[in-house]
């Protein structure tokens, strides 16, 4: 059953590039990318932003009444995170949020995607509200608005209160209702200032990596628990959408899904069918119930699990949405594994350069998946809510951070996004991952995704050269 976990990748060749003063990028063995021309392919009202998550940047895990999260507990288990590192102090954004807003302004961002820490609002998951936690997000949202930056919050980005995990976590149906109650509290407080909300970030990772492979918090390896968690995550999403619209009828509600689209390892019928099965357990398992109202029955059959579906659950899960968020980093190379269980697939990587995460690169797969969202699931308007790459960045003697690989990755994927728009996809925005280098979950502080470099001993933020290139493109797109 572990074979269901989200893994794999594909890459395309590229080499180091040289940033030029005339806003082009020259790559050895390839044509020059005209960033100004690329910028003109996006509408002037296109949303340009950056993303983070509360546990990855805030720190202050024991301040002002915040409760323990499953990631706080997970990081104490030997061997679960790099060097036993946790989200304390991360980027210390709880205290340095004004610095983060200044970085956003310098980059030219029009929006900022961040998450709200459930344990900071409800330390026990339910019950009494921690007013200090709520007040912190209120001042932060006000700070963004004063800077002319649209807040784009996520209600849940993997930091379940440990108290709820102790009572069963996402495999328990009670957690879905607890999430809806939490959503009502937050939206009741901030919904007068924030228009666009996402309920969940990447329920696939919460379920498959948290409860199936055990690679992420809470570190459980149980197939039945994982499938129950997947259902209750989506049920919580639907209940939260209903609760939000009850509290604030004019909000725009969405969900954020990650995908690693399956590429067959060969043209053999066996590998092609393995890729189909992999997509069923990845994108279809989470998209189908939200947009089509049902789970892929084939996955239930070959997994041998019992789904805890009750009357009206699928109607709640498929509640109408206003927008859809796509998180894309890499595709997966899939081969048939006749000796495996579950999906009987082998996940791997093709030859070629990889990011510092070991992930392959193919922007065309993102373009094709954007088109699939439109044609197969008929999603509402779409935002690319995460897309980015990690590289082994370092500060040069002149104090700058030269990261041409990240810039090339960005431009290739923005080109793919523009191609999707030209193919008729209603794509409204792009959020680069990430605003800052930060705590990369089980990888600790070993991987850097930021467009701004964080010197962790001093917490100094320095915009990387890729961030400056991105900023030029944003301003060109907006006519600046």
Features from the language model and the residues they span:
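Active-site mouth loops of central-metabolism enzymes
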Residues: 82-95
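Catalytic domains of carbohydrate-active enzymes, especially glycoside hydrolases
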Residues: 96-117, 323
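Active-site region of glycoside hydrolase catalytic domains
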Residues: 28-81, 124-126, 134-480
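Glycine-rich, proline-tolerant flexible connector loops at the mouths of alpha/beta enzymes
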Residues: 116-129
């Amino acid at each position: 059953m572990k074979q269901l976990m989200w893994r794999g990748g594909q890459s395309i060749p590229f080499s180091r590039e040289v940033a030029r003063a005339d806003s082009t990028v020259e790559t050895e063995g390839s044509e020059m990318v005209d960033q100004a021309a690329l910028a003109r392919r996006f509408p002037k009202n296109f949303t340009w932003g950056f993303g983070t998550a509360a546990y990855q940047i805030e720190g202050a895990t024991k301040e002002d009444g915040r409760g323990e999260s499953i990631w706080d507990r997970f990081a104490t288990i030997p061997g679960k995170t790099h060097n036993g590192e946790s989200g304390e102090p991360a980027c210390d954004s709880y205290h340095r949020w004004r610095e983060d807003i200044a970085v956003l302004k310098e980059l030219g961002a029009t929006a900022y995607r961040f998450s709200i820490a459930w344990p900071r609002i409800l330390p026990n998951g339910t019950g009494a509200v921690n007013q200090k936690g709520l007040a912190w997000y209120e001042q932060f949202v006000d700070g963004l608005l004063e800077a002319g930056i649209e807040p784009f919050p996520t209600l849940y980005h993997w930091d379940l209160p440990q108290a709820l995990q102790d009572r069963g976590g996402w495999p328990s149906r009670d957690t879905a209702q607890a999430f809806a109650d939490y959503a009502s509290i937050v939206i009741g407080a901030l919904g007068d200032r924030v228009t666009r909300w996402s309920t969940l970030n990447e329920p696939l990772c919460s379920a498959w990596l948290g409860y199936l492979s055990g690679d992420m918090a809470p570190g459980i390896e149980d197939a039945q628990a994982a499938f129950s968690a997947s259902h209750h995550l989506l049920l919580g999403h639907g209940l939260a959408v209903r609760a939000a619209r009850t509290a604030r009828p004019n909000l725009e509600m969405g969900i954020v899904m990650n995908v690693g689209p399956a590429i067959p390892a060969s043209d053999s019928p066996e590998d092609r069918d393995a890729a189909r099965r992999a997509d069923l357990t990845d994108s279809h398992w989470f998209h189908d119930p939200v947009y089509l109202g049902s789970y892929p029955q084939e996955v239930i059959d070959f997994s041998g699990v019992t789904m805890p579906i009750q009357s009206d659950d699928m109607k709640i899960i498929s509640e109408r949405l206003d927008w859809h968020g796509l998180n894309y980093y890499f595709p997966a190379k899939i081969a048939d594994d006749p000796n495996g269980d579950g999906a009987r697939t082998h996940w791997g990587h093709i030859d070629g350069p990889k990011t510092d995460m070991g992930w392959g690169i193919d922007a065309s797969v993102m373009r094709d998946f954007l088109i699939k969202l439109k044609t197969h699931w008929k999603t509402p308007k779409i935002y690319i809510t995460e897309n980015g790459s990690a590289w082994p960045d370092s500060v040069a003697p002149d104090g700058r951070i030269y990261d041409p690989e990240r810039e090339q990755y960005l431009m290739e994927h923005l080109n793919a996004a523009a191609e999707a728009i030209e193919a008729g996809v209603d794509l409204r925005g792009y959020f680069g991952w990430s605003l800052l280098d930060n705590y990369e979950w089980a990888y600790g502080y070993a991987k850097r995704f930021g467009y701004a470099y964080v010197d962790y001993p001093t917490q100094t933020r320095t915009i990387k050269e890729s961030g400056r290139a991105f900023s030029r493109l944003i301003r060109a797109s907006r006519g600046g």
